[in-house]
């Protein structure tokens, strides 16, 4: 009996999300609802020409999220299956495909004013904030807002949905007019640049077979008490999901 293997399996089961355990507070920054925060986007240690990282995730299939294998230019069973469903022409399958396709999330390394002791962390946001930031950074009048000597801070505000009448909170970004250094000391700047982590390393990379099993479990859920598959309701004209799975993974 291998005791280490038993302990590893127990740890895996206890980690219900199935993903890599990460100290969220140490690695990520999330703006607080109803407040304004002042931050600085820091040049990326891993790509000095572009500070943002675009990653695609599956939500609701593997809890809490799964990093898509397409981020690694690797064959992805969920993406392949979603693509086949979309091409089927059947509306039910196309609706399911929409749920399965990975969603874009963007990450930027940031230095939060007032929380300098926490160093560089990652700020995660969606397409709308991303487009706004890219629009500002493409404007030559602003210059390089990430420049460590003469860049610009950004004010981030999260407006609660109840104030806007929208379904979700609204995040606004405003670039400060003054140009300022990232930090007063050169040694601090050097440390902020050199100690950054690679964002993709903070998430578990699933293997093809792992993702296939998770997808099959999501499509054909089993009862917790007996492991019996739930009854599937057939409908005329709908492509059989089981057949699709069999054809894809044969």
Each model region followed by its residue ranges:
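OB-fold ssDNA-binding interfaces and closely related basic DNA-contact patches used
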Residues: 1-141, 209
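Short acidic, low-complexity intrinsically disordered linear motifs used
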Residues: 77-80, 234-250
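Compact mixed alphabeta submodule
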Residues: 113-233
């Amino acid at each position: 009996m291998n005791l280490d293997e038993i302990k590893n399996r127990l740890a895996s089961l206890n980690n219900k999300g199935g993903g890599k355990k990460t100290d969220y507070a140490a690695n990520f920054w999330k703006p607080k609802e109803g407040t304004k925060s002042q931050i600085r986007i820091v040049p990326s240690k891993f790509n000095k020409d572009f500070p943002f990282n675009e990653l695609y995730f599956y939500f609701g299939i593997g809890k809490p999220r799964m990093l898509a294998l397409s981020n690694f230019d690797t064959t992805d069973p969920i993406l392949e299956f979603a693509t086949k469903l979309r091409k089927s022409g059947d509306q039910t399958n196309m609706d399911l495909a929409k749920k399965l396709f990975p969603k874009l999330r963007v990450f930027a390394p940031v230095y939060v004013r007032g929380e300098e002791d926490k160093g560089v962390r990652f700020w995660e946001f969606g397409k709308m904030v991303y487009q706004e930031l890219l629009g500002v950074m493409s404007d030559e009048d602003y210059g390089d807002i990430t420049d460590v000597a003469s860049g610009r801070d950004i004010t981030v505000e999260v407006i609660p949905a109840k104030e806007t009448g929208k379904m979700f909170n609204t995040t606004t970004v405003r670039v400060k007019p003054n140009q300022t250094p990232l930090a007063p000391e050169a040694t601090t700047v050097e440390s902020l640049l050199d100690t950054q982590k690679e964002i993709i390393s903070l998430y578990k990379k699933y293997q093809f077979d792992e993702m296939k099993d998770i997808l099959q479990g999501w499509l054909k859920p089993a009862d917790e008490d007996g492991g019996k598959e739930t009854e599937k309701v057939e409908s005329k004209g709908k492509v059989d999901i089981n057949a699709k799975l069999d054809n894809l993974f044969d």
